[in-house]
Every structure is written in C-alpha cells, then in structure tokens.
C-alpha cells in the first residue's frame, strides 16, 4: 500500500501524484517556498483565464491574444523556476565547497606547524650525531652544551622513525592515487551531466512547443464552437475534457510501468487483446477482483493519482509475494473504481490511502484497465539507478555527437477531439447501477458514453 502527498502543479508540470509507502510520509521539500509561489501563480493564472473567458464572443481576438500572452508568461515562469532551482543547488554546492576548503586550510596549517617542528628536531638530531662522530674521531669541538641538551637517538628509535616516515609516504601515495581516480570520475560525470542537460533542454523545448500548440488548438476549438449553444456545446467540452484526462491517465500509467523491471514484461489482463483495446481507445471493461489479505500483511500495492491530480486512483506498483501479486487479478495501471463497495472515483489520494489501509480479509476490488499508448520514446527507457529510478535518455546519440534537439510530434496526431459528437467509448462509469460481473463482461452501450468517461476522469477543479 502506498500513499503520498500531492505534487503541486507548477507551470508546465505533470499531473501525476508521487507514490510512496503508507505510514512513511514524504520528506519536506528543499524548495517549499518555490512550491508556494507555484501554487499562487497557478491560482492567478486560472483566475485570469476565467476572466478572459467572460469576454464577449464578438471580441474573441482579444481573448485569443490574451491567452497567447498567458502561455508565454507561463513558459517564462517555468523557466524562471528551473533557473531558481539551479541557482539554489549551485549555491548549496559552493557553500559545501567553502566549508571543505576551510577545513582543508586548517588541516594544512596544522600540518605545516608539525612539519616545522619535525624539521627542527631533525636538525638537532643531525647536529648531535655530528658531534658524536667528531668525538669518536678525536676532533675537539666545543659542544658540551649541545651534548648536555641532546642525547643521541638509539638505533631502535631511528628504525621506528624510518618506519613511521614510510607509512606517511604510503598514505601520501595512496591519496595521490585516489585524487587521480576522483579526477577521472569527475571528468566522466561532467560529461554525463552535459548529456543530461542537453536532453533536459531538448525536452523543455518540446514541452514548450506542445504547450503553445495545445493552447492554439484549444483556441481554435473555442472559435469554431462559439456559436454552439445548449447540449451540443456541453457535449463538445465533455468530450474534450474526457480525451484530455484519458491521455493524462495513459501518461501516468506509462510512467508507472517504466519503473518495473524490463525483464518482466507487463501483461494485460486476460481478454484484453490489442485489437479490442484499440477499438475502445485503450479502455477495457470494468472487472471485479477478489483479494485475500491476512491481518499481518499489507495489500502489496503502491498507488498514485487522486482527484487533486486529475486522474483516478492508479496502481503504480505491485510488490512480489504480497496479496496483490498472489491474486493475479490486479495489474500496474489499473484504475481502482471501488473497494468493498466504497466508491473511489471522486476520492483524493490521502482519502484513498485511508480506505485501502482499513481493508481486512477478503476484499473485492472494482478496477478498469487502461492500456498506455505506445510511445517511440519508451524504447529508450533503459537506465535505472540504485534507488530504482529510471530515466528515458538518448545517451548513445548525444554522447556520440548526435543532435540533442528534441523531435516534436504534432499534438493533433495525439489528441483526436473532433471526430463527431456521437463517438462512443466502451467504458461504463456510472456510479450507480449494474457494474458488470467478474467475468469481465462489458456493459451494453448506453447513451452518452462520453459523459460516462468524463465522470470517471473527474471534472476540472482549480
């Protein structure tokens, strides 16, 4: 079972909620103040957008220009937040380096004093040995005072001193070797960081382009539909909203599936073949799954999403050997619609965690499978660090001198929103009525399935 706090929707940010374990709240962010600013900006942005929407339809040009400027402003704010985070991180690094340099300076000064004392002692010992040598050869040297102060070192003391010097030299040689290795590692990491920065820059350019392109498409739809009134207008916007939330859902599922082991291919539930899923826009029928949980066990799943993120409660991970894995009926990316009769369609993340954590014994899940769309970038999800985080990078192309620029798809190919008002979706999401059986039998196509899809993926909330 997993839960997590909501991720604030910054300008250009993603909608998904981060999954984390129940009973282990996430750490406080280093940039709490930046999150507050982002929330205030989002609120002001939405307020201005609503004000622009109240302008007379005859002055649609003013609305269009105003929203174009708002898009540019949102992009600038996102870049400013990125730069602020970068500057803050660099500042922390410089502060840490300053502390290290001060510590090294103190150690160096102490070593200098010790070395000066050692040199002084060595000189005195050398003088004492020279005087002893002169005395043995019969040379008369006025050194009685020096002999009285210094006694010549014994052979054992000299051997111990030589051994100590040898150990110190070995430590020095080891430190030099470590410095060389660290320099090589630093050079390699700097190159890797340069590659990551190039990829992030390309991704940001792509996101900025898609943001502007989507805003333009929405404005075009608004201009085309300004003469529509009544049910036809509501139907159009319900369909648009359902399409947007469906693609958001699929994006979150792709991210969840990307965290799983590549050696364990993710399987769709039985009966969900690719052809039937394509006909239904990737949405499978509602199904019921029984899960048996002992009192000393957890459910064995991690969840993400929630009403505040604009997506349903999603299963982001299934832990091996736990009840969810043993039952075999739950899959990563399943949207949890209800559990033991408790409706979770319009539930926030924290509330869903509370409900799921309280379940005992035999538990009935009501879920629906949404197949993520195949993305060309998914082939590059190859890198996974020690913490289990995986990154979608183009390292081979970039490190080989390839073009770091990002290729942007036309959003019109991704979001098909004007294919007729009577387009049907096969997902029945009535919150009351017959919800099907455990045999994965889809409901018969009733009227206004787009309204049902809109109900599943929530209404807008700012």
Swiss-Prot record:
Function comment: Plays a role in intracellular protein trafficking and degradation. May regulate CFTR chloride currents and acid-induced ASIC3 currents by modulating cell surface expression of both channels. May also regulate the intracellular trafficking of the ADR1B receptor. May play a role in autophagy. Together with MARCHF2 mediates the ubiquitination and lysosomal degradation of CFTR. Overexpression results in CFTR intracellular retention and degradation in the lysosomes.
Single GO molecular function: transmembrane transporter binding
SUPFAM superfamilies: PDZ domain-like
Residues annotated as signal peptide: none
Membrane topology listed for this record: Peripheral membrane protein
The organism's place on the tree of life at top rank: Eukaryota
Record's keyword terms, sorted: Cell projection, Coiled coil, Cytoplasm, Golgi apparatus, Membrane, Protein transport, Synapse, Transport
Protein's name according to its UniProt entry: Golgi-associated PDZ and coiled-coil motif-containing protein
Subcellular location: Cytoplasm; Golgi apparatus membrane; Golgi apparatus, trans-Golgi network membrane; Synapse
Entry remark concerning the domains of this protein: The PDZ domain mediates interactions with FZD5, FZD8, ASIC3, GRID2, CFTR, CLCN3 and ADRB1.
InterPro entries noted in UniProt: GOPC (IPR038879), PDZ (IPR001478), PDZ_sf (IPR036034)
One GO biological process term: negative regulation of protein localization to cell surface
Species, as recorded: Pongo abelii (Sumatran orangutan)
GO CC terms of this entry: dendrite; Golgi membrane; postsynaptic density; trans-Golgi network transport vesicle
Domain PDZ: 288-371
Region (Disordered): 427-449
Membrane-crossing residue ranges in chain numbering: none
Entry coiled-coil feature ranges: 83-194
Subunit structure: Homooligomer. Interacts with FZD5. Interacts with FZD8. Interacts with GRID2 and BECN1. Interacts with CSPG5. Interacts with CLCN3. Interacts with STX6. Interacts with CFTR. Interacts with ASIC3. Interacts with GOLGA3. Interacts with NLGN1. Interacts with RHOQ. Interacts with MARCHF2; the interaction leads to CFTR ubiquitination and degradation. May interact with CACNG2. Interacts with CCDC62.
């Amino acid at each position: 079972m997993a839960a997590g706090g909501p991720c604030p929707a910054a300008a250009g940010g993603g909608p998904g909620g981060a999954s984390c374990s129940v009973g282990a709240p996430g750490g406080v962010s280093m940039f709490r103040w930046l999150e507050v600013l982002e929330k205030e900006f989002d609120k002001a942005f939405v307020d201005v957008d609503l004000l622009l929407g109240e302008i007379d339809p005859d002055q649609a040009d003013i609305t269009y220009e105003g929203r174009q400027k708002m898009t540019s402003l949102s992009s600038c704010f996102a870049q400013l937040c990125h730069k602020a985070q970068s500057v803050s991180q660099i500042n922390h690094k410089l502060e840490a380096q300053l502390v290290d340099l001060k510590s090294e300076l103190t150690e160096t000064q102490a070593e200098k004093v010790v070395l000066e004392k050692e040199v002084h002692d060595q000189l005195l010992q050398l003088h004492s040995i020279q005087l002893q040598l002169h005395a043995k050869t019969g040379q008369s040297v006025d050194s009685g005072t020096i002999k009285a102060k210094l006694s010549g070192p014994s052979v054992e003391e000299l051997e111990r001193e030589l051994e100590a010097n040898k150990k110190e030299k070995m430590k020095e040689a080891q430190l030099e070797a470590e410095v060389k290795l660290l320099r090589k590692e630093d050079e390699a990491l700097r190159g890797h960081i340069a590659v990551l920065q190039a990829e992030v820059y390309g991704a940001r350019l792509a996101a900025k382009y898609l943001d502007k392109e989507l805003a333009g498409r929405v404005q075009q739809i608004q201009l085309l539909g300004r003469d529509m009134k009544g049910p036809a207008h509501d139907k159009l916007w319900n369909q648009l909203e359902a399409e947007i939330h469906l693609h958001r859902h699929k994006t979150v599922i792709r991210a969840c599936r990307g965290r799983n082991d590549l050696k364990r291919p993710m399987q769709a539930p039985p009966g969900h073949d690719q052809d039937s899923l394509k006909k239904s826009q990737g949405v499978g029928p509602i199904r019921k799954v029984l899960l048996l949980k002992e009192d000393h066990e957890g459910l064995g799943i991690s969840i993400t999403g929630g009403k505040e993120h604009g997506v349903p409660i999603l299963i982001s991970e299934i832990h091996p050997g736990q009840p969810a894995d043993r039952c075999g009926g739950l899959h990563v990316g399943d949207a949890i619609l209800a559990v033991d009769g408790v409706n979770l369609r319009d539930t926030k993340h924290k509330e869903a965690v509370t409900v799921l954590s309280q379940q005992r014994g035999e538990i009935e899940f009501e879920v629906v499978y949404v197949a993520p769309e195949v993305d060309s970038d998914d082939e590059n999800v190859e890198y996974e660090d020690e913490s289990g985080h995986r990154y979608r990078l183009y390292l081979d192309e970039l490190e080989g001198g390839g073009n770091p620029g990002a290729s942007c798809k036309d959003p019109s190919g991704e979001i098909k929103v004007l294919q007729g008002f009577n387009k049907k979706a096969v997902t029945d999401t009535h919150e009351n009525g017959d919800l099907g059986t455990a045999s994965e039998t889809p409901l018969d196509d009733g009227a206004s399935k787009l309204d049902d899809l809109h109900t599943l993926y929530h209404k807008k909330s700012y």
